[in-house]
Structures are given as structure tokens and as C-alpha cells.
Amino acid sequence: MAHSPYNEMYLEKGAGRAHYQRYAQWLGEQPADRLAQKRAEADALFHRVGITFAVYGQEEGSERLIPFDIVPRVLPREEWIRLETGLKQRVRALNAFIHDIYHEQQILKAGVIPAEQVLCNSQYRPEMQGVDVPGGIYAHIAGIDIVRDGAGEFKVLEDNLRVPSGVSYMLENRKMMMRLFPELFSAHRIAPVDHYPDVLLDNLRSVAPTGVADPTVVLLTAGAHNSAYFEHAFLAQQMGIELVEGQDLFVRDEAVFMRTTQGPQRIDVIYRRIDDDFLDPLVFRPDSMLGVPGLLTAYRAGHITIANAIGTGVADDKSIYPYVPEMIRFYLGQSPIIGNVDTWMLRNPDDRDYVLAHLPELVVKEVHGAGGYGMLIGPAASGPEIEKFRQQIIAAPERYIAQPTLALSTCPTFAEAGLAPRHIDLRPFVLSGREVTIVPGGLTRVALREGSLVVNSSQGGGTKDTWVLET
């Protein structure tokens, strides 16, 4: 049975949902000109702070402000507790999976996942076979994309385990809302998020190599041209650690050092924000100018921790995603608390035949795609676009998965004509160290174009503050 989109704030007859009622009443009492003035103030402040991201291939300029909407997404405490429990379960299983495939490969031997889908995956790193990492933790930082379907059920849409981004916008959105509307934070008990950098740093320090009492942590960036450079600089500053580029580091005697004006300083943990391919030109891409020659040697020797671990990307590949519920059963002996979105694997002939016959109804994604690129949304696509994807699927079916076109939940959002429903998702950030921790809420992304289901900032999406109510 098809469902219309679930409205996060309002019931079908227009009354506010219980957890939104106080906010909905406040919103209805606000003069339109005050809200317009606050929206303009938010834009001006974000411009001043420089909260931008780079857009590649855009002639009009590379820097763009991520639009911020002043209507928050609100989650009641009981919903958040269930989400939090399910997210922790999922990330524990994903870490167990990554450890397993680089060691005993029990899940492959049991036939739960076809071995070739893992071992022939471009994100599988044979160099990591047999490498033990502190605590058996590979995905120290995970951004899990959650959607709510028309029936009101939460589903995991995507696991982001390589270099998940967006947490700086979560933190800045909260600061902005507290500045613009302090009265709302007096009227609601909203779980704080500003301790995220402290929790992240504590987790990174907790996974330092064995025997290091006072670890030195750095954040490795590709540089100012990177699309998420604002976030790199922001997090380094918030954690009080050095922001470094590959040229700032070197390896000597299987240890990693940072060049400083006082001489070389030993480094224990690297929070890397660059992909595996660029980390070590002696092992991966030889033309990389972003990494550190010899880094993998130091890593394999156990003298440096890299977060997230090299080779983690195999677990966030979209061709592996359909198997995560089975990972939870296999490694934890539990049923998944948060389900997956139904997914067709186009490498399977029956799935491929079905999808090719129903392309105008489905969403098709490249298994290595990200940022909303390399995707077909059938109901919104033209005939030529659908035909182009059809030919691409026939030529290389293993490169694609397909999913139903979900009626993503909506939240009132300011549009040109006033408040209107817009589709949203949620990216909570899951931190793994001594324990698995989630700062309440996450980054709510919103598709600003009417009817659009694409929330990615690179595709014109915006963001909202996410409130988790404590009572």
C-alpha cells in the first residue's frame, strides 16, 4: 500500500504532533516580518563565519553557502532512544564485519555474503589483511543516513564510513538557533550537541597505539580546495589539535612525525579526511601529493592509528549495504532494530529484469556513487535519461542497485511563498572508541526544491537544526 509522506510536525487533520505542539504554537504567534528578519540574519552570520562548501564543475564559482532553514526537526525522546539503540547495533556489526573480512572471513565462508562481492570490491584493501587495529575498531566515525517512510518507520538509507562529513553544520546550526531564538531553548528541554568535539577527541585518544599514555592527535586534510575544508578546520580548532596536510608529516623508523618549528613531533593518531587512495603514494596512487610516503608501513607496524581505518570503505559500498541486516544477525545474534530500504541488486538477473521493466518507478544508484551524483530518480526523470540509465545498467549491471522511490518524510520549511513541506533525512554521527557514543540528533538535510527527494548540499539541499527532546 502506497503512503503519502509522513509530516514530522503535523497530523493529517492539521493539529501539531504532541512533541511539536509547543513549537507549533510559538511559530503561529510569530509575525512574518520577524521570521523573515531572522532568516536574513542567519544567512548573514553564516556568510560572515564562512560556512561554505566547494562545488566542483561549477563555472559560477566554487564556494557556496549551505542554506539553513530556521524551522527545526524535532524528535521525541522515545523515538531517539530507539534510533540510538539501533544505530549502535548497526555500527557494532559493521565494525565486526570489517575486522572479519581482513582476518578469518567467517561471514564469507558461511556464504552469507558472496566472497567475490567483497574481495573484488574496489574498496577492499588486501594490504589490510591480518592487520590488527586498536580495539578492533575500523569505523571510528560513522554517518548513518536515516529516512522515515510514509508509514512513519525509520529506515537506514546509507552507511557513510569512509570520511563522513556534515557534523560541523550540525554544531553551527545549533549555535545559530540558540542565538536567533533563545526563548525556544528556555521553553523546551533540548539535548545539547556542543560536546561532540570533546567526545570525538576522547574517542580518538582512546584508540591510540598500545602503550601511548598521552597521545598526540592530528587532523589530516587535503587542503583548502577540499569541499569540506571548513569542517576540517572547524573540528581541528574545536578539538585543539593540529590541522595538517600530507607535506607536514613524514615517516621515520616506522613512526610518523609532524614537522614543527621546534623540530619533529611524534604523532599517534591521525583523523584523516582524505580517501584511502591518496594516503600513501608508495602503496596506493603513486601520483598522490596529499598523503604520507611510508604511512602504511607505520600503520601495519602498529605505531600509528588512522581513523577511519584504511579499508573501511568496503563496508559503506552500496553493493554491501543490502547485507547489513544479515551482518547484525551473524555477528550479534540479534534482529535489526532499524531496517534497510528494500534494495534490488542488479548483478542478480531476476533483480535486473524487474528493475529494467520498472525504471520509471524506481531510484537507481551507482554502488560507488556519493553526494547525489550518479543516480536516477525514475519518477522525476525524462525519457532520454531513463533510456541512458537502461543502457548503462545493461552494460555493467554490477555497478548499480535500485530502490523504491520513497515518500521521504516532510517538515515545514521556508520557501519563497512561505512555509511549505519539504522532504528531509537525518544523518546521526556515531563515534566508536572505548564505547559507542552518539550525540543526540544529527544533521537534518532538507530538499529545498518543491517535490525534490535529493537532500545533498551538492545538489541544492539545505540543513535544519535537529532537536531531541529530553522530556
Task: Label the predicted regions.
Residues 1-471:
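Preference for protein termini
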